[in-house]
Amino acid sequence: MMIFVICIIAAAVGAVAVLCVLSRHNSEEAKYKGAAANIYRDKLLKWSLMNPYQSAENVLSADDSLFVYIKNAYSKGKHQYVFCVGDKVYIGRGRQDNQLILSDPLVSEKHCLIYAENGVACIYDLNSGNGTVIKRGRFDKGFMLNGSSCVLEDNDVIILGQSCLKIKIFKVEADLFDQR
């Protein structure tokens, strides 16, 4: 009888741990999707201010609604970023002209570029010294881009030098504007 009670308690504690992880994940997702909605809203506002006599309906392309959430793949740090892929995201060590700056000595000044093409996120290695490795799935060894490009997929890991970046790709939906 006592063993049965301990098993139930252990199972309940495990369920609480799973719920906490799911809750934290949902909170993280809500934050980066909320940030993307704000960026999208700002793009619409900027367009409206530049074109005061035109309707802002359907002015942004499919590429403008495509976003990427980037975070360090192996640590729970503060460094998390949300970018509109339609704006082109340059990643490198250099402080000029890069949207994401990595302080890794094995990363080139301008290492790679994330961009949108026909509503799909792509990555292009800018002939970096050490190349760009894309890992897909848990057991994938990855493949090297060296001066070439490929389509990015959700949950890809980009390896630049010693830096590993996990990617989430998503589109801004109209219902994101209703969240507050």
Predicted regions and their residues:
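Short histidine-centered beta-strand/loop micro-motifs
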Residues: Q80-Y81, L100-P105, L113-Y115, Y124-D125
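Residue-level marker of beta-strand positions
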Residues: S65-F67, K88-Y90, V133, V151, ...
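Short hydrophobic/aromatic patches on the structural cores and recognition surfaces of FHA
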Residues: I91, H111-Y115, G119-Y124, S128-V133, ...
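C-terminal boundary/linker segments immediately following FHA domains
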Residues: K135-R180
